Amino acid sequence: MKKRVVCLGLTLLLLLNAALVTALGNQGWYLVLRSADTGQTYGRYPMTEGDWFSVGFVHSVNKSPVIDCYEIKHHSIYVEKTIYYNFGAGVQTELEGNETLSYGKDGAMIVSGFDREMSDLTYFVGTVSDHTLIVNDGEEISLRNLCGRSSKVRFTYEWLWS
């Protein structure tokens, strides 16, 4: 009888331990994409300090690619650089503060040195051309497919329990 109680107790302890590992296994820091209008979660991607992500799109006026690059620092999202290929309305033409301009081998203009926290990072998903999220491992996610055309998408960096 005593053996049976001990075995039952150990079995329950192992089951409880497995349940805790499963429940806590998905907790951590995530890049979270939500509807800025409804709060609906579109997606979440695990990230840690020092990880990068970018959002690419085709500029609506000059019809060339633009890539905004962000880094996770101090548990926040920081814009670090922008890559673009043509000047046009809404494209930076002057450098400020510690910003620098360099050129890529493909002719890209790279403005870096922003190092600016983005407390409210929101994108409007294009109707004519898509916006693409690129996360750590190079995975490309179509924001049009994930969120829908004309969606207003808010990016946050959050601790999530599950």
Task: Describe the function of each predicted region.
Residues 20-35:
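Aromatic-capped interface at the extracytoplasmic side
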Residues 28-30, 52, 67, 130, ...:
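Exposed beta-strand and adjacent loop surfaces of beta-rich binding modules
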Residues 80-81, 90-162:
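Mature, soluble, non-transmembrane domains
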Residues 34-83:
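N-terminal secretory signal peptides
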Residues 61-62, 85-87, 117-118:
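Short, surface-exposed beta-strand-loop junctions and turns on beta-sheet-rich folds
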Residues 1-4:
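Positively charged n-region of N-terminal signal peptides that target proteins for export
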Residues 7-24:
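Hydrophobic membrane-insertion alpha-helices, especially the h-region
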Residues 10, 14, 31-32, 36:
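Hydrophobic alpha-helical targeting segments used for export or membrane insertion
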